Amino acid sequence: MEIRYDKWYSPALGRDMEIKTYGRGGKPVLYIPCQDGRFYDFENFGMLDAWRPFLDAGQATVFSVDTLDTETWSYKNGNPYWRIRRHEDWMRYLTDEVVPFIRMICREYGWKTNPGVMAFGASLGATHAANLYFRFPDMFDELLALSGIYDASYGFDGYMDDKVYLNSPLHYLPNMTLDHPYMEKYRRNKAVICMGQGPWEIPESTRELDRILKEKGIPATVDYWGYDVQHDWSWWFKQVAYFVPKLLEN
């Protein structure tokens, strides 16, 4: 398996940012780490081993980035007005810098056109991944979200403004009209949203998202695993093994 490390100064964030790439060829996957996570968590917490069969087979290439959660979602002593705006800086970093980097690497690997990217994450990483998928369906055409929450006000102590709204699928999706141009993109794309029902899981958020998607006619596989399925890496590894082959099918 090919592994590469890159770092560059991010204009969006005003600092150096790091990224690690695993694999060569196949579907590009943007991995968003769990809360407060770093780019090396994909490897250090064992998620690399869960993806290894797909990476070794040339079916996928994973790009693992840093979060900015310590300045945004987790910064409980900060002003939520500024925390959510810092989060938007991070979103611009992903869309304006990381996605072009992914496309550049894909061209090096032989892609003739810009491929769609799978957004993938667990826990708060799933929250961010789902938001990327629903906000930017031109860039992100597949989603694997495990054990996420989809109401952004949860991360900002109930605070709500236009920026929180833009990052909260449970708020913006209900207001999308059925003829919104994104609707056709959602229908072409593929999404898997999975939630356990055991300790530390919050299935209510997924159930509400499930209801909204059905109401809007937005296709997605929304799967609820058993009451023994905890909010834990060992279960996310099992879910990756189960769902990734389905997402990688042509």
Tell me the role of every PLM-derived stretch:
Residues 1-250:
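Non-catalytic cap/lid and distal C-terminal segments of serine-dependent acyl enzymes
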